[in-house]
């Protein structure tokens, strides 16, 4: 889900007839209606005007392939319903791009692209021009001999940092390969981590193990951290006095993505 910058609307993903559609409602959940259907629609991100939304549209691919392999970034005007492919720059329209996140000022977009061989975090102008990778890392995990990918970018409220997931893709784990290998699955999940990179790509640091980074309104990054004793993941947040748990997920429960509501 994603709350509009004016705090009045909520866009979220809803499964309808084995497809994932985008739905729009008031921040209180009233007046829900379908916004986008057809294919798999994920990871909506608002522009600052609180009218336009970009998102990732995915078409079916081969079994075992990552959804981002067949994705494009779309934009919709929620007032008119008009949609189009976001990137108009001629050099960019030939690439497959996914997982968009619009910068707080609406001038830049962070996204995931495989144009250099593996999924990396890229940043460009909103039309796709001046695109460049910003978070360099190793191409392969030395122990597993599998590609290291980067996904799920998230901008800090001040636009200076981008948090993202990094690790070996889940498609190499038993539920996707059909071959049970618990030890290998644990090795793969141990690679899941959240990183921070400056928006210009000059600075980078590891936050810790986990997935699905978000930012609190006051500029602290969160991550979903695996916890066997808890029977499911827990949400950790960095603070000025150290890291602590956000008690928002009940024990022994799975959860979906979450977003912060305006105060």
Where is each model-derived feature located?
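Sequence signature of WD/YWTD-type beta-propeller architectures
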Residues: 1-263
